[in-house]
Design a protein with these regions (language model features):
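Conserved catalytic cores of phosphodiester-cleaving nucleases, focusing on short active-site segments
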Residues: 23, 42-44, 49-57
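Catalytic cores of nucleic-acid endonucleases
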Residues: 56-101
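Domain-level recognition of nuclease-like catalytic cores that cleave nucleotide substrates
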Residues: 92-126
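Charged phosphate-binding loop/patch that engages nucleotide di/tri-phosphates or the phosphate backbone
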Residues: 115-162, 166-167, 171
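Short, flexible, glycine/charge-rich loop motifs used to bind or transfer phosphoryl groups or to couple energy/partner
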Residues: 32-33, 42-43, 82-84
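Catalytic phosphate/metal-binding cores of nucleic-acid and nucleotide-processing enzymes, i.e., regions
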Residues: 33-37, 50, 59
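Short, well-ordered alpha-helical microsegments
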Residues: 39-40, 102
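Acidic-basic catalytic patches of nuclease active cores, encompassing PD-(D/E)XK
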Residues: 1-33
Length: 171
């Protein structure tokens, strides 16, 4: 049965499965919190880096979306209506455009208060309004930064040397 006949909940679940597979393929650890009361779908880990990720998707294959962009709702539905995600709730939106098998890993700050965005995975050049092309397949954003890792190792080594020096002075 084509994905379009499954309903939005099932298609969202398919996108979440696709995210787990792709993130794990990139060497990123993926954990799903118990229940569905958290604002994020997954916690991801790479080295010491942890991030909260909300998965969104678009499965439509209707004509015109190549030109007009694929719509992705990047807000949450709550009792108060549609509300924005905040950096206190999530770190990234992982948006999946299923017809192109394209992923966009977008920091929540880059959404700049938008409730929906349009993505253009079919085009190679940036179109007017294609603000998120820099985030297409940007899995490196979920990974530990090598400079950050090296800096942390240096800090750990300095801390160890300091503790050893203090012990030597105490003797």
């Amino acid at each position: 049965m084509p994905a379009g006949h499954l309903g939005t909940k099932r298609m969202g679940e398919l996108a979440e499965l696709a995210f787990m597979y792709r993130a794990a393929s990139e060497g990123i650890g993926v954990a799903r919190p118990y229940g569905d009361s958290h604002p994020y779908d997954f916690l991801v880990q790479h080295g010491r880096r942890l991030a909260r990720v909300q998965v969104k998707s678009c499965f439509t294959t209707q004509r015109g979306y190549r030109r007009m962009g694929f719509p992705i709702i990047v807000a949450k539905h709550a009792r108060k209506g549609v509300t924005l995600y905040s950096p206190d709730e999530i770190d990234f939106i992982a948006a999946f455009v299923a017809p192109h098998r394209a992923w966009y890993v977008i920091p929540v700050e880059a959404l700049k208060g938008r409730k929906s965005i349009r993505l253009y995975p079919g085009g190679k050049s940036k179109r007017i309004g294609a603000f998120y092309e820099d985030y297409r397949e940007a899995w490196q954003l979920l990974k530990e930064d090598k400079k950050e890792k090296d800096r942390q190792q240096q800090d750990d080594q300095a801390s160890t040397k300091s503790r050893l020096s203090e012990r030597a002075l105490q003797r």
